[in-house]
């Protein structure tokens, strides 16, 4: 089953959605879902000494400006296994450019993590959490000779707008 396409739309509201985890927090392995099969494939091992600061994946039934499902970082007190479904809510978004293309990453929190589920907006997190995420995305491709530019860290309302935009883009691409 391809988790990108076969999660019921009713389970994917902008303010309450299931994220599919591709990469667990602390990993240097860059996995991506194979769009054709839905299988997880190893894209590369990060060239830098950095590791993913949060669990990383995508929101099913979305189509982002970079031609992939919308990325999501899931802040959680534990590592989450790849291909797990995690019910989350958005608290913000990091907007960046990756090789000249817009690349937005939703920041989300699992409803069932008592360490994080009191936060409703990225502005409520300790400053260091957002700084660590920004730093990771600034440097994680540098030794590959690729440039990334982190431009904005925006709150929950902007994240919800981006999720809606990417859900609508998915409908236009795959459901019409």
Which stretches of residues belong to each language-model region?
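Hydrophobic N-terminal alpha-helices or hydrophobic patches in metabolic proteins across all domains
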Residues: 1-176
């Amino acid at each position: 089953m391809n988790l990108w396409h076969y999660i019921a739309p009713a389970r994917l509201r902008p303010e309450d959605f299931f994220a599919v985890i591709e990469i667990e927090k602390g990993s240097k392995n860059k996995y991506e879902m194979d769009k054709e099969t839905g299988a997880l494939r190893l894209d590369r091992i990060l060239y830098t000494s950095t590791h993913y600061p949060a669990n990383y994946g995508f929101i099913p039934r979305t189509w982002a400006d970079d031609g992939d499902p919308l990325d999501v970082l899931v802040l959680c007190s534990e590592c989450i296994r790849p291909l797990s479904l995690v019910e989350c809510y958005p608290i913000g978004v990091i907007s960046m450019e990756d090789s000249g293309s817009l690349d937005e990453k939703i920041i989300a929190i699992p409803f069932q993590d008592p360490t994080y589920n009191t936060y409703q907006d990225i502005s409520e997190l300790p400053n260091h959490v957002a700084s660590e995420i920004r730093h990771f995305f600034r440097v994680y491709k540098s030794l590959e000779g690729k440039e990334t530019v982190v431009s904005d860290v925006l709150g929950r309302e902007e994240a919800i707008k981006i999720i809606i935009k990417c859900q609508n883009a998915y409908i236009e691409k795959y459901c019409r």
